[in-house]
Design a protein with these regions (language model features):
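C-terminal His-loop and adjacent cap/lid subdomain of alpha/beta-hydrolase
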Residues: 1-299
């Protein structure tokens, strides 16, 4: 292809799929279960700190929040304890080794990357009263490729076992992680790459796509060189690139037109039309303009 538009790309395959085990590993390690009601309460507190849902989902800044500030508050699931806050902070921090070195990125505080009953998201609670969570189905499927044990369940993974699984997957499938910035042949052939990612994506961490963009900048010697063939758009509030999340996303027509214009007519994309629609009626709820990513936007 002369042009590629990767929307909420499933790159860094090993890392983000195994990231679905992390919340369960945290609860297992700390011997404390965080209920869905308390989990939701933490999300609501993040939104409140940023001025409410609307303000939160339209901020271009990476949100930060310390769950310890909620200790002692009353939630629908009971009083928030130190143990609750410890689990929440560790989940937000993302997978890492015992010495603190990161394995991969977590999800931003305030982002709901889990569900109750519905097995969609990074992880889910099988029932509203569950005392255990489960990862997104692709996580265990991929992990079985790593261990070559088709019936392995990976329940009650310890932290050390999780890190070992993570390292084993990286070593075994290192050539298939879709994270290589050395796309020189594509670039030299005149190829153009557009990427976008919603900050409210519940399946793939937004920072993983930003990480790949930074690898491109490093590999090709700076942003000016990358600008000749690549554009990255980070859309606050947009879900998994579907335009019906909590903020507007780039439409298929706008994205494809921009890519075609760039590849066939040499017109580099700048601002792109984005929209938020009602998931059932299709009615337009919000419109806006997506702008190319700049480092000061999200640090």
């Amino acid at each position: 292809y002369n042009g590629v538009w990767a929307s909420c790309p499933a790159i860094n395959w090993n890392h983000f799929l195994l990231g679905g085990f992390w919340p369960e590993v945290v609860m297992q390690e700390k011997k404390h279960f965080l209920s869905s009601s308390k989990n939701r309460f933490f999300i609501e507190q993040v939104h409140e700190r940023y001025g409410g849902e609307t303000e939160f989902y339209h901020s271009t800044q990476k949100p930060t929040f310390d769950a310890d500030t909620c200790i002692g508050m009353r939630s629908p699931g009971g009083v928030i304890t130190q143990a609750d806050a410890d689990v929440m902070n560790e989940i937000w921090r993302g997978p890492h080794r015992r010495d603190g070195r990161p394995l991969w990125y977590g999800y931003y505080p305030g982002i709901k990357n889990w569900q109750v009953v519905i097995p969609i998201g990074t992880y889910y609670y099988p029932t509203p009263f569950s005392k255990k969570i489960k990862p997104f189905i692709l996580g265990p499927l991929y992990a079985r490729w790593i261990t070559e044990e088709p019936k392995q369940t990976f329940e009650d993974l310890t932290w050390d076992e999780y890190v070992e699984l993570f390292d084993q997957g990286s070593a075994k499938f290192g050539d298939n992680l879709a994270d290589d910035p050395c796309i020189d042949d594509f670039v030299q052939a005149g190829g153009k790459l557009m990427m976008d990612h919603g900050m409210d994506d519940p399946l793939i961490p937004t920072d993983g796509t930003i990480d790949y963009y930074r690898k491109l900048v490093q590999h090709f010697g700076g942003k000016a060189a990358v600008d000749k063939f690549c554009r990255l758009y980070i859309n606050p509030g947009d879900n998994h690139g579907n335009c019906w999340g909590n903020g507007p996303g780039i439409t298929q027509s706008a994205g494809m037109k921009a890519l075609v214009d760039w590849v066939e007519h040499g017109i580099a994309p700048t601002k792109l039309y984005k929209v938020r629609i009602h998931p059932k009626t299709g009615a337009i709820l919000e419109e806006g303009q997506a702008v190319p990513f700049e480092e000061p936007e999200i640090l």
